[in-house]
């Protein structure tokens, strides 16, 4: 992709309304544009990142055995009256009427709809277990949306819902998502710590929030420092191995970790002083087991092996991809701009042509772009008629993992300069070695 033909509306000045780093950098880097309070358009660069985040989430959901579907954003109020949540949910729910005066709503969550879908098709325990997920836009009318996509009114969510015959099966489903979330966040370059949390309006008696530590976090968290060194479950983990998953969850919940709502000062004091961490955190995922809270009132029942009908046990599991983009920036940036982890970067390489119009430099850049793309790398070539300093600043701001710097002086010596954005390390390599070098780094 040539930057001269791309749509990248970079801002030179820091927007006054941006309170936190991620909001400032997403606006400055031309990733998003605010359309109304808490509502953003995702511009091309931002959308590429958002899509890469959802790819990782989808891959780990599929690996765990969850099955993707897609539910609509508009829901019937009648479903919510069945569960008893229509009046209880409050003003965050955007309530609307269609032309026939039927009461509808813009879905803030999907427990009711997924339960209705399930009950219409599943009648027997032989069709269990099931875990269904979707990735869809939601709307919650926050009183005070702030911090950009970190706390917006419209946001993208991955919601998964598990259905099991009994509590034992439901807890195994919960453990599957617990492990899938650990792997998801690690692949996104985040160190997430699962913490005991309140269930809130979702309900239930078992819940964990996945928290990343960040100075700009909206909540106070308390945990044992040992979590920072815990190993992530491998891709080879068997999600059907009940004992192995339980052992992993037991290990990841063996030490103290709690949000402020669940904090127990006496228990925290029992943690060795050198291991105690009281910090700010950002919630990047939330999982719940809520038993028969929705299946009971909504009639989602199956016939068990004894021939008796019973309500299914359910859980729900949420990750916000649009919120995650901001969280990744909060965790990975410097004074110059964003530092994208390789797994979610919008492009792998920023190819900087330092002398546009010079025949040799233009030809070298064209050849390098072709070779890099043939090697499986995505490339954004800065072919704008700008001074080198402006190109370096843009490359640092948008944070692509590698910068390939092409200028007449280096070409005269048969060399190219490479810069690793995350570390700032630079190296000089032969022109023909660039593509093999970066392909090897990606692998």
From Swiss-Prot:
Q: Which GO terms describe its cellular component?
A: cytosol
Give the record's subunit note: Homodimer.
Query: What is this protein's record name?
Result: Proline--tRNA ligase
Q: Please provide the record's keywords in A-Z order.
A: Aminoacyl-tRNA synthetase, ATP-binding, Cytoplasm, Ligase, Nucleotide-binding, Protein biosynthesis
> Would you identify the family this protein belongs to, as annotated?
Belongs to the class-II aminoacyl-tRNA synthetase family. ProS type 2 subfamily.
Chief location bin = cytoplasm
Q: Where in the cell is it found?
A: Cytoplasm
Biological function: Catalyzes the attachment of proline to tRNA(Pro) in a two-step reaction: proline is first activated by ATP to form Pro-AMP and then transferred to the acceptor end of tRNA(Pro).
* Main EC class the enzyme belongs to: ligase
- Kindly state which reaction or reactions the protein catalyses: tRNA(Pro) + L-proline + ATP = L-prolyl-tRNA(Pro) + AMP + diphosphate
Answer whether the UniProt record assigns the keyword ATP-binding to this protein: yes
Q: Which NCBIfam families match?
A: PRK12325.1, proS_fam_II
A GO MF label: proline-tRNA ligase activity
One BP term from GO? prolyl-tRNA aminoacylation
Q: Which gene encodes it?
A: proS
Q: Known HAMAP family for this protein?
A: Pro_tRNA_synth_type2
Q: What is its EC number?
A: 6.1.1.15
The protein's matches in InterPro entries, at most eight in alphabetical order, are given as: aa-tRNA-synt_IIb (IPR002314), aa-tRNA-synth_II (IPR006195), aa-tRNA-synth_II/BPL/LPL (IPR045864), Anticodon-bd (IPR004154), Anticodon-bd_dom_sf (IPR036621), Pro-tRNA-ligase_IIa (IPR002316), Pro-tRNA-synth_IIa_bac-type (IPR004500), Pro-tRNA_synthetase (IPR050062)
